Design a protein with these regions (language model features):
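Thiotemplate assembly-line natural product biosynthesis machinery
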Residues: 1-18, 70-74
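Functionally critical, cavity-lining and gating residues within the transmembrane helices
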Residues: 2, 35, 48
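Phosphopantetheine carrier-protein modules
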Residues: 11-29, 45-53, 57
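Amphipathic alpha-helical interaction surfaces in cytosolic regulatory modules
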Residues: 31-39, 59-61
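C-terminal structural segments of small proteins and small subunits
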Residues: 49-74
Length: 74
């Protein structure tokens, strides 16, 4: 699951490379529209539904992975 999240982030934000330190703070393309696209990709890829309060705390790779794990994604 962790590698798939990295792959999604890399493709979605059009990055040449990506690592586990990626966050909204260090990714220029991770803006509000990028966040909406990210949510759609994650929901589709992992067959989950994200609540608005969950979406608001997804500001880094680590936050995304922790949230997915809390939803039982492996």
């Amino acid at each position: 699951m962790e590698q798939k999240v990295l792959d999604i982030l890399k493709a979605l934000f059009e990055l040449e490379t990506v690592d586990t330190s990626i966050s909204q703070e260090n990714c220029e393309n991770w803006d509000s529209m990028g966040q909406l696209n990210l949510v759609a990709e994650l929901e589709m890829e992992f067959d989950i539904s994200l609540e608005p309060e969950e979406i608001g705390v997804m500001i880094s790779y680590k936050d995304i992975v922790n949230l997915l794990k809390s939803k039982g994604v492996k």
